[in-house]
Every structure is written in C-alpha cells, then in structure tokens.
C-alpha cells in the first residue's frame, strides 16, 4: 500500500534474503522504478538472483553483494523509499547512512522492530543471548522517534514495523 501511495522510483532494500520483497516492490511500484537490494549471506544470493530471473525482473533489480554497512557507506544516490529487513541488531549502525541516502519526503520502513513483542519486555526477561540485539533495537526505535528530521509511527502487527517519513 505504501508503494501505491508514495509511488517511489528509487527503492533501496537492506536485506534481500531470497528476493521476495524486491519482487513485490517491482509489482507495486510505478513503471520505471529501480530497486537496489543488498545481501551478505552467500547462500541466499544465487536463490535471489534465480528468483529475479524467473520473475523477469533482472533489469529492474540490482543486487549488491556484501556487508550492508560497507555498501551503504559507498552509495551516493538518494532514494525515495528504503526498506530495512536485515540483521536487526545492525539497524542502529545502518541509520546514519540510511538517513544520508533517504531524500526529503522519502519513506523508511523497518521490519521486525518489535521482535514478537519482546522488545518491550524488561532487559532481564529477554534471554541473555538476545540482549544486545534488543538493546540496539530499543536505541534504534528511540532514534527514529526522536529524530527531528523524521515523523515515525510504530505498527504493532506481527513482529512490528516502523514507517518513517523524512520531513527535513
């Protein structure tokens, strides 16, 4: 629905996985939209490429292989829609580059931000191995809600998502 409302032409996805979201972006974005997607996990990359080929969308989707932090820091083009669906504990580290790349009026959607609702639990209720991820996600949510350049809403459905619009 956001793609239908915003009609983005330059879309950036951080976290390709097998390419499902990128293919959906192709389906719902306006004609001529270009999708750039980033994936690090070597086993997913050939699956995503094959899915793009089978969907006939190879010309519309550019898959960048490697570490998202490194790739984001090297990008110079701005985007009018950015979708974050990568390593959840890294969102906070990606944010400075994502903000640099998101044009004024652009939309940032971050997926899985509530971690099945556990993100609102006490630090001590969260399993020890997940505490760093949850701490970083709380920091990320705080930054989104308090950054004067953004208007952000948290959508508490499933694992949660945020929808942010850059206003400055």
Residue spans for each PLM region:
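S-adenosylmethionine/decaboxylated-SAM
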Residues: 1-168
């Amino acid at each position: 629905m956001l793609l239908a409302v915003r009609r983005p032409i330059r879309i950036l996805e951080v976290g390709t996985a097998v390419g499902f979201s990128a293919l959906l972006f192709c389906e719902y974005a306006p004609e001529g939209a270009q999708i750039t997607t980033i994936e690090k996990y070597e086993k997913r990359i050939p699956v995503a490429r094959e899915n793009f080929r089978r969907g006939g969308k190879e010309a519309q989707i550019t898959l960048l292989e490697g570490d998202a932090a490194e790739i984001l820091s090297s990008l110079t083009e701005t985007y009018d829609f950015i979708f974050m669906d990568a390593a959840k504990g890294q969102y906070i580290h990606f944010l400075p580059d994502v903000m640099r790349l998101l044009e004024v009026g652009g939309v940032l959607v971050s997926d899985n931000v509530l971690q099945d609702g556990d993100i609102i639990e006490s630090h001590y209720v969260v399993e020890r191995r997940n505490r760093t991820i949850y701490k970083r996600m709380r920091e990320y949510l705080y930054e989104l809600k308090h950054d004067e350049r953004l208007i952000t809403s948290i959508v508490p459905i499933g694992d949660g998502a945020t929808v942010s619009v850059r206003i400055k």
